[in-house]
């Protein structure tokens, strides 16, 4: 593992990064190197926090599934049972499960929302409640890049009275001693790594000759991607006010974690401390998405989807197709392997927007764990 981790730096693929892994309840890997800033003046530390973007969805999904196991939520129930206003515009039958496996059709609002709108949680939820789905719910797959966190977060708030970030902190992170955050106090943000080569939305949509917010997914091949980014500022993933973006809660996209913290979280799943094995066997059943996704196209072909998590159906991240976790745009990834009792996480600050759960930097290390264990 140390050799594979070092090679990423030698080959010029990293600026700062960390990787951690637990096996059978024992911390066996905890490596970090490089710098947390592009200028090379801020050494990466064991508690350096990195933005994991959609890796946040693995944290949020686990919070939601804890409520399901307690009987407070039902995955087969309509979202509108918990959030009545959501039933508008043909959404009365959309279930929580549809949202968690990206099949609800609510990938974004029907109008563009700039950064000033996004910081108003109630306004975002009002727009989503009024929005018509972009396809008939349940009939197709399309990645809920930002709406995943808002829809589940609003349901969570209405049922518990707390936000996902508050619950994560008090019920999971603090008991585990894990550095995992959704919404980070400004007093803690000095520990955050700068994002380098961060993905710009304009670059991702640069080949689209169709200005303006789409009115239909048929307008151009990347219409779904444009809609799913409908909450993001015009220039980059994140915001023009990074301190505010880190401080607010976006339960689908702005988690701040250390590699050790995220691996500790997934180790707790491996140890069945957060969810029962019976429930985890349910949520890692494939819900489709291996071939076509109306937002990501064929980019999901490496994994497939469970209920809130990425799977490993093509065995890219090791030989076990039944692991589950979540990657984030840029390269971070974390997962749990129940059969081999592994909790793994890799984070970095040099973003590669071309990979999600299959970034070569992480893939080589996740496979190395299995090689060391002799698992084929």
Model-derived regions: residue spans:
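Active-site SXXK
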Residues: 2-6, 25, 49-76, 152-157, ...
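Short, charged, amphipathic alpha-helices and their helix-cap/turn boundaries
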Residues: 31, 114-136, 162-179, 228, ...
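Flexible glycine/proline-enriched surface loops and loop-helix/loop-strand junctions
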Residues: 45-47, 131-138, 148-150, 241-251
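Active-site Gly/Thr loop motif
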Residues: 198-259, 285-339, 376
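Short, gly/Ser/Thr-rich active-site loops of penicillin-recognizing serine hydrolases
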Residues: 271, 275, 284-295, 354-376
């Amino acid at each position: 593992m140390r050799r594979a981790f070092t090679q990423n730096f030698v080959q010029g693929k990293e600026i700062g990064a960390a990787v951690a892994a637990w096996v059978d309840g024992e911390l066996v890997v905890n490596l970090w190197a490089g710098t947390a800033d592009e200028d090379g003046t801020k050494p990466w530390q064991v508690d350096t926090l990195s933005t994991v973007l959609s890796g946040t969805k693995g944290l949020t999904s686990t919070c939601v599934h804890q409520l399901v196991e307690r009987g407070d939520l039902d995955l087969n129930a309509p979202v509108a049972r918990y959030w009545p206003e959501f039933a508008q515009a043909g959404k009365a039958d959309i279930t929580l499960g549809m949202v968690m496996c990206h099949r609800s059709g609510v990938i974004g609002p029907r109008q563009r929302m700039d950064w000033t709108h996004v910081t108003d949680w109630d306004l975002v939820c009002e727009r989503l409640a009024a929005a018509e789905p972009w396809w008939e719910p349940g009939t197709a797959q399309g990645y809920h890049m930002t709406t995943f966190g808002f829809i589940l977060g609003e349901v969570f708030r209405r049922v518990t009275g707390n936000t996902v970030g508050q619950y994560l902190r008090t019920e999971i992170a603090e008991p585990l001693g894990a550095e995992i955050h959704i919404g980070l106090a400004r007093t803690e943000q000095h520990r955050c790594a700068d994002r380098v080569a961060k993905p710009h939305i304009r670059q991702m949509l640069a080949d689209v000759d169709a200005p303006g917010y789409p009115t239909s997914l048929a307008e151009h091949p990347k219409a779904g991607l444009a809609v799913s980014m409908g909450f993001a500022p015009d220039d980059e993933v994140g915001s023009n006010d990074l301190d505010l973006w880190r401080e607010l809660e976006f339960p689908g996209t702005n988690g701040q974690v250390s590699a050790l913290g995220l691996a500790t979280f997934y180790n707790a799943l491996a140890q069945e401390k957060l969810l029962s094995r019976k429930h985890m066997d349910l949520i890692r059943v494939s819900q489709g998405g291996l071939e076509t996704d109306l937002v990501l196209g064929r980019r999901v072909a490496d994994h497939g989807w469970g209920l809130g998590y990425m799977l490993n159906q093509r065995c890219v991240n090791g030989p076990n197709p039944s692991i589950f976790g979540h990657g984030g745009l840029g390269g971070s990834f974390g997962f749990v392997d129940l059969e081999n009792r592994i909790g793994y996480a890799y984070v970095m600050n040099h973003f590669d927007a071309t990979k999600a759960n299959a970034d070569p930097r992480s893939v080589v290390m996740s496979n190395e764990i299995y090689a060391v264990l002799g698992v084929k």
